[in-house]
Design a protein with these regions (language model features):
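Extracytoplasmic small-molecule ligand-binding "clamshell" domains
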Residues: 1-46, 53, 93-95, 109-127, ...
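A conserved helix-loop-strand patch within extracytoplasmic ligand-binding domains
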Residues: 18, 26, 47, 60-110, ...
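Extracytoplasmic/periplasmic mature domains of Sec-exported, cell-envelope-associated bacterial proteins
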Residues: 35-36, 55-57, 73-76, 90, ...
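Periplasmic-binding protein-like
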Residues: 50-51, 59-76, 140-178, 229-231, ...
Length: 317
């Protein structure tokens, strides 16, 4: 076995000396087995008032998980956060999952309603979606389904380790290990999230709304980008090819590949004023700038979110 929870439990075992036997059961059966004492631990579970009556939880969370709503990759009827078209669509839920409560709240917030079907495992949910028994399925973000299309993400909540109510011996050992891990490996949760959650999302298709999808389809001419150089390795002209290259260009080409929006690059001199270039009407975007307060305060210029951070150093003899 491997994954986020397994990695966390392996770290805990370095302090407890435990060896694990993993039981592959439906989520409903896992909860029942834990309640009866048939199993000792469940890793990665949300804390609720109802669950606290039957289970004990670790003293601190071991990560954060969102609820993720998926549909089939070829479903052209539902787009990201397309609540109007989600209304009335049938959704497959995992029985006794915390995310079900989050989804109920989401429907109320966004004013849509979906008939629900319940399944014993995520595999059952996926099969129901593939067989067109449901239009969407809801899972946690720790599980990643690359062959499906994400249509909503919401309800980030902390995850804990659970044990049987009153099992103080096991939970005390878990809590002691977690406290030591926090002191000795403070970035463990961040690193595991990077490895098992963020890495899975990097090559995903963009989460486009219906309006954004229609815009991409409507783009006939390349978006013109003025690129301020010469700033190797960020942006520069390759001497052999005569073409623009560097981190900015690689990023924009990848963005173009994922989004389907074509770009056309034009080199600008290093002393180009980015605000004047943006206001000239010759370019749709200006690349190769460092955000500063002047640009942030400029009402006629809009900045994208940052995607690259660099440090400057003063060097002297």
């Amino acid at each position: 076995y491997k994954g986020y929870g397994v990695e966390y439990l392996n770290k805990i075992s370095q302090y407890t000396g435990w060896r694990y036997e993993y039981i592959n059961e439906s989520w409903e059966n896992q909860l029942a087995d834990l309640k009866s004492g048939k199993v000792d631990l469940i890793c990665n579970a949300q804390k609720t008032e109802a669950r606290e009556k039957d289970y004990d939880f670790s003293c601190m969370p071991v990560g954060t998980e969102q609820a993720v709503l998926y549909t089939s990759e070829d479903n052209e009827d539902i787009y990201f956060q397309d609540y109007e078209h989600m209304n009335g669509k049938k959704v497959g839920l995992l029985r006794d999952s915390y995310q079900n409560e989050e989804f109920e709240q989401r429907q109320g917030e966004k004013n849509f309603h979906c008939p629900e079907e319940y399944y014993e495992s995520e595999q059952d949910q996926i099969e129901a979606l593939e067989q067109k028994k449901v239009d969407m399925i809801l899972t946690g973000s720790i599980s990643k389904h690359d062959s499906l299309k994400i249509v909503d993400k919401f309800g980030a909540a902390p995850m804990y380790i659970m044990t049987t109510k009153g099992n103080t011996e096991v939970m005390s050992a878990v809590n002691n290990a977690l406290e030591q891990l926090k002191a000795e490996v403070p970035d463990l949760t961040e690193n595991l999230t990077e490895q098992y959650v963020m890495d899975k999302n990097r090559n995903s298709k963009p989460l486009l709304t219906r309006e954004e999808t229609e815009y991409v389809k409507s783009v006939s001419a390349p978006i013109k980008i003025g690129c301020i150089g010469d700033q190797p390795p960020l942006i520069y002209t390759d001497k052999e090819t005569g073409k623009l290259d560097g981190i900015y260009i690689a990023f924009l080409k990848k963005f173009s590949e994922i989004s389907g929006i074509p770009f056309e690059f034009e080199s600008l001199s290093p002393d180009t004023d980015p605000i004047e270039a943006a206001q000239s009407g010759k370019y749709d975007f200006i690349a190769g700038i460092t955000a500063c307060q002047e640009m942030i305060d400029e009402p006629e210029v809009h900045l994208t979110g940052g995607f690259f951070t660099r440090e400057f150093q003063i060097v002297t003899e």
